[in-house]
């Protein structure tokens, strides 16, 4: 089950291996994330590859009237819950990551996947309304139908 298993790749230690390049280039595997442009810019410095089937959530959420670009805010709008980002600025180059760092990395990936899946559900059900005449704010960006 994709929700129960996450993998943390320490690219600073392993480099960008061929199996990871194959995954990034595989059009059958959807890659979902936030600020992917920055991630791919860093990955391209490690090895040449052509990524396929990537969903940039900062752009994708706009189709649903969400203007916010932070993972915390997007997650809060869709699920009414808060996720912790306290480990974001910690030392990711350390030889050993702390448990909170590992939890942060897993939560970050899990939240992106949940956001994407929720938006896919809304796309299918049409259970949202856009109000283009009014400026969109954090909690008003996505209004679900009763």
Task: Locate predicted features.
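Short, basic/hydrophobic alpha-helical segments
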Residues: 14-28
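Acidic beta-strand-to-loop metal/phosphate-binding motif
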Residues: 29-36
